[in-house]
From Swiss-Prot:
Name of protein: Large ribosomal subunit protein uL1
Lineage of producing organism: Bacteria, Pseudomonadati, Pseudomonadota, Betaproteobacteria, Rhodocyclales
NCBIfam families found in the cross-reference section: rplA_bact
Provenance organism: Azoarcus sp. (strain BH72)
Quaternary assembly: Part of the 50S ribosomal subunit.
Gene: rplA
Keyword Membrane among record annotations: no
């Protein structure tokens, strides 16, 4: 069994694993535990009361975090004509159509998020085996297949995060950095939880927000009261 470092032991000692914390206190504690030499990400994990093995209970979508994510996102847009110009004007880093598809096929993928107009999907669809495994395939459910490329690009640049339940009904997202203030992190967490609540499937039964926990990249997880997380 691998030894647990003194640093990790000290971090774990600060967190009462049997306690469910109010959100502001939990976020302050997570920030206190973020002692790495880099600006750690602050993440949330939410266990939802859904059977994600059933297609009608998969929770998927996107939300713009009001305080941003602290990360610079490079955005690619597959579009032509006026839509291509609109994407460039909105701040897209890479814009193209067949030429961009050829770049991707050649192994040049210098972007973090991909947006496409509906007519471009005939080209993008051929890139599924390349973009899919990287989580870059545009999808209308998260707003990345759209005619409104201006809004899509601006949202991506402003701090939009995408989410989807895994097979166990768990959703993960980054809601900021350790350098963020507690208030900014709380605003982002509230926005994320509200988005999950709005996306609740009609087929979901019983308690929906079963467990909410926040953590930093290298820190311990801290459970949060679901009611205060969405207050």
């Amino acid at each position: 069994m691998a030894k647990i470092s003194k640093r990790v032991q000290a971090l774990r000692a600060k967190v009462d694993r049997n306690r469910i914390y109010p959100v502001a206190e939990a976020l302050a504690l997570v920030k206190e535990c973020a002692t790495a030499k880099f600006d750690e990400s602050i993440d949330v994990a939410v266990n939802l009361g859904v059977d994600a093995r059933k297609s009608d209970q998969v929770v998927r979508g996107s939300v713009v975090l009001p305080a941003g994510t602290g990360k610079t996102v490079r955005v690619a847009v597959f579009a032509q004509g006026d839509k291509a110009e609109a994407a460039r004007a909105a701040g897209a880093d890479v814009v193209g159509f067949d030429d961009l598809a050829e770049q991707v096929k050649g192994g040049t993928i210098d972007f973090d998020l991909c947006i496409a107009t509906p007519d471009a999907m005939r080209v993008v669809g051929q890139l599924g085996q390349i973009l899919g495994p990287r989580g870059l395939m545009p999808n209308p459910k998260v707003g990345t297949v759209t005619m409104d490329v201006t809004t899509a690009v601006k949202n991506a640049k402003a701090g939009q995060v995408q989410y989807r339940t895994d097979k166990g009904g768990l959703v993960h997202a980054t809601i900021g950095r350790a350098s963020f203030g507690v208030e900014a992190l709380q605003q982002n967490l509230n926005a994320f939880i509200e988005a999950l609540v709005k996306a609740r499937p009609a087929a979901a039964k019983g308690v929906y927000l079963r467990r909410v926990a926040v953590s930093s990249t290298m820190g311990a997880g801290v459970r949060v009261e679901p009611t205060t997380a969405s207050a």
